[in-house]
């Protein structure tokens, strides 16, 4: 079984996130989504639009998502969450490149394939 993991704030979730999730699901047999926690959201934006439990429930309800968790990380990365899940693939959206992400170090260490550029940047949650 090929396990795929993706991550995001989904704060708020928008059509670009749906495309990202749908494309990620096509990469493997099971898709696990890491939802960045409220602490990470505050680090990035100063505050959350929606709290982590609401964002998690919305993500879990999406048909292509097999499982979703709240990130266990305390910084702006999902490195510890990736280490916990141990996916075969870690995928990023169209606005991220694998050379730019801090998660590339843990993925390389664990032999996890990184795929970037899933979908186009259709929207940005920071516009809301």
Residue ranges of model-derived segments:
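Nucleotidyltransferase catalytic core that binds NTPs
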Residues: 1-128
């Amino acid at each position: 079984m090929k396990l795929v993991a993706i991550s995001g704030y989904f704060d708020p979730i928008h059509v670009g996130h749906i495309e990202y999730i749908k494309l990620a699901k096509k990469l493997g047999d099971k898709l696990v989504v890491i939802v960045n926690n409220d602490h990470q959201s505050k680090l990035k934006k100063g505050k959350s639009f929606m709290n982590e439990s609401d964002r998690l429930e919305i993500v879990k309800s999406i048909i292509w998502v097999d499982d979703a968790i709240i990130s266990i990380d305390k910084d702006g990365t999902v490195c510890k969450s990736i280490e916990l899940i141990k996916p075969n693939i870690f995928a990023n959206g169209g606005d991220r490149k694998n050379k730019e992400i801090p998660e590339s170090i843990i993925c390389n260490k664990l032999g996890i394939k990184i795929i970037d550029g899933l979908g186009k940047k259709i929207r940005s949650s920071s516009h809301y």
